Swiss-Prot record:
A motif (NPA 1) lies at residues 81-83. It is found in: Membrane. It comes from the Eukaryota. This is Aquaporin AQPAn.G. Residues 48-56, 121-137, 190-210 are extracellular. It is a multi-pass membrane protein. Keywords: Membrane, Repeat, Transmembrane, Transmembrane helix, Transport. InterPro entries: Aquaporin-like, Aquaporin_transptr, MIP, MIP_CS.
Length: 250
């Protein structure tokens, strides 16, 4: 491959201009993020006789991602998360232009999902509509660190279970990804709301007009996704001749 061809592949102009399935992929990312945000923040609403629990919210987000990955994975890969998309750009599994179009679709889907839940929920129940916020006493720097840590875990798991060079993975990749999201919520929801996904925070923030510390939920997850992608590519990506005989057999 020439240097010019390599650059074109990384940028990915042909992914947009020549790929006849690109619109299906973008619609899949829109719908996937729409349902992620709608179902996810729907679990956070507090009614007069019922308040959501941390466990309920954690498993709702994890299960909806696992389910959507099964539904849309064959179409777009079901990233439904800018941090995941950027992490895959770092490992050259997704081109820059395709990734940019994915992220726009994800953000629009997140806004639509939040808007539908707000419209379908009584005003006295809407509350903050699942807008993520930093816990009192936590600095924005600490918030960025927490979001980076839990997003690193998520994106690293995505790379690990979706590495098509591996021959030892026999379990459910979507379930593993969903459980990593559940684990992140169980550990960090009390710190930052456990976003792990810039689009998940962006949608409710836009609909509610509440942009307080929103940058934390872009910077933290994106940094975590980039580092996870780089670490996986440099040290853990399966290469020809690698020995996998000692891998866990799921």
């Amino acid at each position: 491959m020439t240097e010019s061809a390599g650059v074109k592949q990384i940028v990915g102009v042909s992914d947009i201009t020549e790929n006849r399935n690109i619109w299906r992929m973008l619609v899949a990312e829109f719908l996937g993020t729409f349902f992620l945000v709608a179902i996810g923040i729907g679990s956070t609403t507090g009614w007069t006789d019922y308040s959501p629990t941390l466990t309920q919210i954690a498993f709702t987000f994890g299960l909806v991602v696992a389910t959507l990955a099964q539904a849309f994975g064959h179409v777009s890969g079901c990233h439904i998360n800018p941090a995941v998309t950027i992490g895959l750009i770092v490992t050259a599994d997704v081109s820059i232009l395709k990734g940019a179009f994915y992220i726009v679709s994800q953000c629009i889907g997140a806004i639509a999902g939040a808007a539908v839940i707000k419209a379908a929920t009584p005003s006295e129940v809407v509350g903050g509509l699942g807008v993520t916020g930093i816990a009192p006493g936590l600095s924005t720097g600490q918030g960025v660190l927490i979001e980076a840590l839990i997003t690193f875990m998520l994106v690293f798991v995505v790379h690990g279970v979706c590495d098509n060079r591996r021959t030892d993975v026999k379990g459910s990749a979507p379930l593993a990804i969903g459980l990593s999201i559940t684990a992140g919520h169980l550990a960090a929801i009390k710190y930052t709301g456990a976003s792990m996904n810039p689009a998940r925070s962006f949608g409710p923030a836009v609909v509610m007009g509440n942009y307080t510390d929103l940058w934390v939920y872009w910077v933290g997850p994106i940094v975590g996704g980039i580092v996870a992608g780089a670490v996986y590519r440099l040290f853990f990506k399966v290469r020809k001749g690698d020995e996998e005989s000692n891998s866990y057999d799921f």
